[in-house]
Amino acid sequence: MTVPSAFRGAMRLPAIAAPMFLVSGPTLVAETCKAGVAGTFPALNARTPDELDAWLGTLNADLAAARAADPAAAVAPYGINLILHASNPRVAPDLELICKHKVPFVITSLGQPGEVVKAVHAYGGLVFSDVIHAYHARKAAAAGVDGIIAVASGAGGHAGTQNAFSLVREIREFWNGTL
């Protein structure tokens, strides 16, 4: 991937550990980040907004302590996956918490990322968008995302049906940013 400038020097490997439903949580994410890989989890893994608030507070404290203990260490940023589909009643409260805790990056899925981009960019965070087709990538790019995640055939979760090589090639025809 083309590494965003905000991530340079903070990662040992230019990779994002996937936000795995019911698997990824604050402990896994913190340890992943301490190993120099960007860790993520789905917002909905925290079963309530109160739990999400606690998780984000814990993550920020754990990673700040790791950076303070070894300033030379590559402690990667963490991110959160926010499902934007209309069936998710927690989009607004979760986005509020994301902004409160200034989550370094947000991965949007299953919806238009425009409002998330505005909110997250307001505090200096980055927004990446999951896409399964070049059509969706164009919409995400137009919304101002900082990166596009090509979810191709064989990916976990809400996978697309297109081959990764052809999907990336199609997106690269118009997108020069982080992919």
Please give the residue ranges for each predicted region.
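Active-site entrance/lid segments in N-terminal catalytic domains of soluble metabolic enzymes
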Residues: 1-178
